Amino acid sequence: MSNNKKLTSLFGAPVSDRENSMTAGPRGPLVMQDWYFLEQMAHFDREVIPERRMHAKGSGAFGTFTVTNDITQYTSASIFSEVGKQTEMFARFSTVAGERGAADAERDIRGFALKFYTDEGNWDLVGNNTPVFFFRDPKLFASLNHAVKRDPRTNMRSAQNNWDFWTSLPEALHQVTILMSDRGIPKGYRNMHGFGSHTYSMYNDKGERVWVKFHHRTQQGIENLQPDEAAKIIADDRESSQRDLFEAIENKDYPKWKTYIQVMTEEQARNHKDNPFDLTKVWYKGDYPLIEVGEWELNRNPDNYFQDVEQAAFAPTNIVPGIDFSPDKMLQGRLFSYGDAQRYRLGVNHWQIPVNQPKGVGVENICPFSRDGQMRILDNNQGGGTHYYPNSDGSFEDQPEFKKPGLKVEGEAYEYDFRQDDDNYFEQPGRLFRLQSKEQQERIFENTANEMQGTTLEVQHRHIRHCYKADSEYGKGVARALGVDINDVDLEIKD
């Protein structure tokens, strides 16, 4: 059935022949004046944009966030201003280490990025399906990427590189334990929790600040894959999580998550046993219980994957009044890295791409000072109005009513060794290990041994030592699974 759409060039000229190039005679060479061939091939040569350095393989969908509980005592953010208020949103889930062609069912951390189109601007909440991370200083970001990506000589993923890096950082054990557990391979994106991971802050209309962590709990139930199940799925379908999410939404089986916060006062933070801004640790729910905030569902698939998912740009600098940052060093590092990566990948005007536009405010109502740059098209480039400040016509006036409360800091600017401040690497992973059933613990041992195939004895000993310091049974179990005599491991080396 024809839709009667006639082929044109990019600039609207009719195309007379889609299949046959212009040649000098029926068997002669091409001629350069075949403008449609040149246009088509030149565009094709540039179709692929740089993939994300991490989180390259992803899936996304649009949805709606609904406030279900009053938290205005903590925040003045308009998105949370009243129970029942709804805000449009976009979510992108991803694997982390693999490239765009990687399989969805690999053992890996999963990215969990949310964009809320609030009436005060876009709010991006960028996190993972784990509440912690491998380290707590952003200077190690590039090294993590190199360690989990392809080896520069073999161009293959290297267990040795991966585990050598992880085990060189004793604080990584918490994240590694989660990754080697059943939750290391979610069945699909619909069946996993999400976390903002970092510590953020909220402040209310009185300027009172609290520290918060965000949690998103799946309403579909947690479901994970065992390695043999994952291997069978990968053999048949490398897009298993994408397919599951897309088909569920197409079938109107809309996935839902409930959002919660943990709240810590500034006084509690000052007296907290550990650094409350340390991304390698959690806040125990018994001390800081979950407070329900809202629920969101994903109910619309993108019409075009490239336009909406591949070009979606998230950055933790996209916040709204009532929500702010914290001294979390990893968050501080991401404040630069994410936006800078998007400017490289998509261009300085990526905010004009439909999925990134501040829809809750309305593009016609924004007044950015930035002008020009490649592909500036959306807002008439601010027209012929004033393009400097200060000025006499009132353009680009500040909005002082949105000033944030001050944050008291102390100490000299210095490259402090965080290990001198906190070397409590093993308490939380040990506690996590003991929360597992015996069967779950055995699977951690087996998964660890499988993933460590090809690593040196030095690296294996290092990991066994860390596990033993978290819990002696943890270390013994990993040693047994690796076929290592634990008596050969020096368990007394200080990490």
From Swiss-Prot:
Q: Where is the active site?
A: 55, 128
Which keywords does this chain's UniProt record carry?
Heme, Hydrogen peroxide, Iron, Metal-binding, Oxidoreductase, Peroxidase
Q: Which reaction does it catalyse?
A: 2 H2O2 = O2 + 2 H2O
Source superkingdom: Bacteria
- Positions of the UniProt region annotated as Disordered: 1-25
| Obligatory cofactor(s) | heme
One Pfam family here? Catalase
Q: How does it assemble?
A: Homodimer.
Q: What name does the UniProt record give this protein?
A: Catalase B
Q: Which organism is it from?
A: Staphylococcus xylosus
Gene name of the encoded protein: katB
